[in-house]
Amino acid sequence: MTVNAFTSCELICRKILMHVAVEKGAKEGDTFATYLSYLEEQGFVTPPMKGWVDLIRRHGNNATHSLESPDKKRAESTLMFTAELLRLIYEMEYMSKQYTEET
C-alpha cells in the first residue's frame, strides 16, 4: 500500500479469496462470484459481511477489466476485509481446535 499499488492490492486479495474457497472445498475453475457464493453457503461469510463481499467482487471486476486504478480507500477496504476473513477462517479454526479438544 505504501507504494500506491492499489490495483495489485485488489487483484491479490481477489486471488487469495479464490484460493481460500478452493482450499475449503469449492471446485477449482469456477467464477469468482461462484467462489464468493461458496464461502457464503459454507458459513465463512456471514450475512452482515455479504454487502462487503459484493463490493469486493465489484471492485475486483473493475481492477481486472478496467485500466482505471482503484483509489487508496477502496484498496484498503479490500485488504482489511481479506485480512480479517483469513483470521476468522484460519486463526479462529486453529484456536477453536486448541481450546475444544478434550485432554
Regions of interest found by a model, annotated:
Residues V22-H59:
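Short, charged amphipathic alpha-helical segments flanked by flexible coils
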Residues G51-R58, N62-T103:
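Charge-enriched, short contiguous segments at helix-coil
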